[in-house]
């Protein structure tokens, strides 16, 4: 009875709203991920699971930690549809997100997208990246999605260099403004620790 009520509330409020869950390839071998797949499918929740497969779970390559190449297929045993896309390409990611949104809104069921991408830097500031070669990183930098988007805008959409520079300046300003706002803001009250956290 409670689950029917919860689902009714969710569907009433989420006709155009979808919960998004982001996880890395390293998390895909954790049991709670399969529990989440099971419940999302069982309760027909409007959830979009997004796997950022950057080939390394912290310092362990995907080939050494997971059997099988298609991580999104692990959700299919729970009846969750999904796909794998080139996560280094803005347009394929955008198209996949639109397909996922439409599927979830039309079927009231979860969906999963595996984004095949890459992490250029270490997992943290203390990660010296000794588990991969500089050649590997440099090769992947050749298809850096930011640089590829810049090239696409210049060549295919005929953007001017000045326009690109203005966009880059605007983005840098936004980042600095957010950083300043964050540093200037007071720390939250300890009472807020569990606000909107549901156990």
Regions found by a protein language model. Name each.
Residues 1-184:
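Glycine-rich ThDP/TPP pyrophosphate-binding loop and its adjacent helix/strand module
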Residues 184-199:
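C-terminal intrinsically disordered, low-complexity extensions immediately downstream
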């Amino acid at each position: 009875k409670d689950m029917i009520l919860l689902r009714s509330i969710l569907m009433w409020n989420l006709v155009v709203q979808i919960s998004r869950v982001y996880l890395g390839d390293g998390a895909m071998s954790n049991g709670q991920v399969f529990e989440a797949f099971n419940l999302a499918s069982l309760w027909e929740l409007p959830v979009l699971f997004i796997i950022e497969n950057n080939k390394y779970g912290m310092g362990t390559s995907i080939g050494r930690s997971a059997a099988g190449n298609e991580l999104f297929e692990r959700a299919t045993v729970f009846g969750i549809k999904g796909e794998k896309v080139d996560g280094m390409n803005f347009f394929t990611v955008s198209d996949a997100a639109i397909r996922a949104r439409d599927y979830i809104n039309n079927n009231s069921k979860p969906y999963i997208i595996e984004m095949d991408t890459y992490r250029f830097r270490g997992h943290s500031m203390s990660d010296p990246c000794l588990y991969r070669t500089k050649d590997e990183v440099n090769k992947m930098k050749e298809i850096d999605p930011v640089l590829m988007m810049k090239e696409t805008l210049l060549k295919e959409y005929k953007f001017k260099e000045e326009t690109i520079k203005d966009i880059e300046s605007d983005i840098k300003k936004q980042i600095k403004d957010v950083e300043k706002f964050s540093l200037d803001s007071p720390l939250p009250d300890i009472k807020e620790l569990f606000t909107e956290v549901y156990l």
